[in-house]
């Protein structure tokens, strides 16, 4: 697809479809011969379970992952990153670290995310069993100017993916 590495950063609420699209994109890029790695919020948190959910913890976590993504990018590896990354300031910090940063906002209504709640996290947050849960009792700050917005409420996974690949093809052929 491209010879220049980039960081493709998916952001959005839990259950928006970030990981689904990110995993599909990694397969697509690898099949196209592109060197790439997936950094996924759930996977990384399983490796580092001590990472908390306070604003400070989340900011530090996103910045660490951004630093890792920028290192991989510098070494010619495209990074597909899937993190809720709820705060604009930390996403903007990551953007500045990366040479070729593409922010993909997976815009999905809270209602849709709650319907998709395969992990049961929204139910636990609504019952007060989980606190500082993004979208319930902790804010999500939508990007102001993402390179791409995908609205998974209104699109199938395939439609969203085609929109994503179409955008990436268009921007890499310029």
Give residue ranges: language-model regions.
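Conserved lysine of the Walker
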Residues: 18
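ATP-dependent NMP and nucleoside kinases share a basic, alpha-helical "lid"
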Residues: 47, 51-52, 69-126, 132, ...
